[in-house]
Amino acid sequence: MNFENLLIELGTEELPPKSLRKLAESFLANFTEELTKADLAFSSAVWYAAPRRLAINVTELALAQADKVVEKRGPAVSSAFDAEGKPTKAAEGWARGNGITVEQAERLVTDKGEWLVHNAKVEGVETKSLIAAMAQRALDKLPIPKPMRWGNNKTQFIRPVHTATILLGSELIEGELLGIKSARTVRGHRFMGLKQFELAHADHYLADLKEKGKVIADYESRKALIKADAEKAAAKIGGTADIEDSLLEEVASLVEWPVVLTASFEEKFLSVPSEALVYTMKGDQKYFPVFDNAGKLLPNFIFVANIESKDPAQIISGNEKVVRPRLADAEFFFNTDKKHTLESRLPSLETVLFQQQLGTLKDKVNRISALAAFIAEQTGANAVDAARAGLLSKTDLMTNMVMEFTDTQGTMGMHYARLDGETEAVAVAMEEQYKPKFSGDTVPSAGVSCAVALADKLDTLVGIFGIGQAPKGAADPFALRRAAIGVLRIIVENKLPLDLVTLIAKAQELHGTHLSNANASDEVLEFLMARFRAWYQDKGIGVDVILAVLARRPTRPADFDSRINAVSHFRSLEASGALAAANKRVSNILAKVEGALPTTIDASLLTEAAEQALAAKLNELQPQLAPLFANADYQQALTLLAGLRESVDQFFEDVMVMADDEALKNNRLALLNNLREQFLHVADISLLQ
């Protein structure tokens, strides 16, 4: 079989930078899926993407589908011939349809009978006749929420398309992509190199674009180049560039020929909290801030131009002029905000509605304050600081700085709290109340911060559920799933001795009569328990382990986590499989018992050696298990219980539980019930697979 390399490029207007990677990856995934469906062999496939192009390169693509033998089964031999042994009309019709005679048909014998069969050879179709249609189908399936039309064209895409190139080796493949005929024409950089050129061979794509068109089409190469050059530029001025991957991705998606440059701003702006300056540089301008070795912001920034200029100083000056007004705004807002304390802004919270039925932001901070103090008392944190931090928690939302630079909420609250002379615990809680903000983010670690963060999230959860607006499907306008995961993570990762039932009840109490849903507390608890399952699954914990713990309904998240870890460890023990099966057997036996289960074991009724041994082993372990259960040392408890394997196996081998003698039967049921109860102190291990 012959092979050749394939290149497909779509030339467009500037594509959305935050969608570029996803578009390219989806294009590749969709196209390779088409190749697989068409039984076209290939060695490897990669995607390329730049602001004005999406491309795919497939290496060693088969030039045709492999020939196949297709089995075409006909009628059963019993019905293919009449009494005289002549072919029936049905058999002749089937044979004619396959281009053979009945006599040429083969016989297939199965356990269900004998059949006429024709093994037809089907020649593979040439790849070049399939590619264009496959590429179009791959494009049709791209995740484009809002496609657009352009010119008089009825075709829709995320941005206008100008060129399409499909090359199989050196051969131009005829066809259309999004209404554009395939041609060798490839567009270069807007301002450098050749505006367009003819591509002779699929293998020349990257090199020709770089040399002739001044475009680095390989996204990952472009990204790596920007990162390396930015790091070098920062090192030259004695600093380290803040190169966040999401920003690096966006910048790499904005330029085709990256040129890294260093600029500066007036040192007077460093009097403004660095977070506000960084927000402006990264969020608005897509610049990389630079910090010194002590983590202090330097009056410099690194940016990426999309052109190799003969006068880079002019480009640097232009970028400095662009950022200066934004930094001046931040300075003005900061100086203006400092004239008023956070406490003085409390009345203004009454003018902002949190939710129609749940009141204003002032109502919310009052509830957060009370709930934070309640939580702090249970965790040993400073309740006075927790109440104060809760009260002030949303006041920075009324500052000029946060209104203009919304992502600085909490952070600016921390800075303003320090300027107001609030305690450090209160100031830090102002910032950490929103943690964790995203998957993988850190959680608050200080006691006051934990109390405020939990209070804020629980107030929202109970309030929104309380007015009947729980998330439905994918819709979650109040980000309740994130809040729920946040509650669990804060409690688990800080090992806080908090009970969800108690917290939910207190939050509901603080909402007073505003909640219309009588089942709110139960629904919030169920919602949180469901998040446990999702969270632990994301961490790679087996579903059966999670279900085994969920069966016990532990409502203390830290305790839940201890049980998960213990059961996960138990599963690694050699005895776990047999004991899980035994517990399942015990559960099935006890489930059939009518009425209350017997609980008292009479030693005089233990007539079999195996049941005597099991009872003795349980009696030996129970004094050791009791303190372990009391201290939530579930891992050690299950390790001890694993030692019951031989006794349990022997019991089921030798003892008839459902004996005819009622007293013996009940005594054995009591023994099994006692056995099961020891495991149920931790989890229902009968659910382990």
Swiss-Prot record:
Top-level taxon in the UniProt lineage: Bacteria
EC identifiers of the protein: 6.1.1.14
UniProt subcellular location: Cytoplasm
Keywords recorded for this protein, A-Z: Aminoacyl-tRNA synthetase, ATP-binding, Cytoplasm, Ligase, Nucleotide-binding, Protein biosynthesis
BP GO terms, sorted: arginyl-tRNA aminoacylation; glycyl-tRNA aminoacylation
SMART domains: DALR_1
A Pfam family this chain is assigned to: DALR_1
One MF annotation (Gene Ontology) recorded for this entry: ATP binding
Cited InterPro entries: DALR_anticod-bd, Gly-tRNA-synth_bsu, Gly-tRNA-synth_heterodimer
Catalytic activity: tRNA(Gly) + glycine + ATP = glycyl-tRNA(Gly) + AMP + diphosphate
GO cellular component annotations of the record: cytosol
Main location per the UniProt record: cytoplasm
Subunit structure: Tetramer of two alpha and two beta subunits.
Family: Belongs to the class-II aminoacyl-tRNA synthetase family.
Classification via HAMAP family: Gly_tRNA_synth_beta
Protein name in UniProt: Glycine--tRNA ligase beta subunit
Organism of derivation: Shewanella putrefaciens (strain CN-32 / ATCC BAA-453)
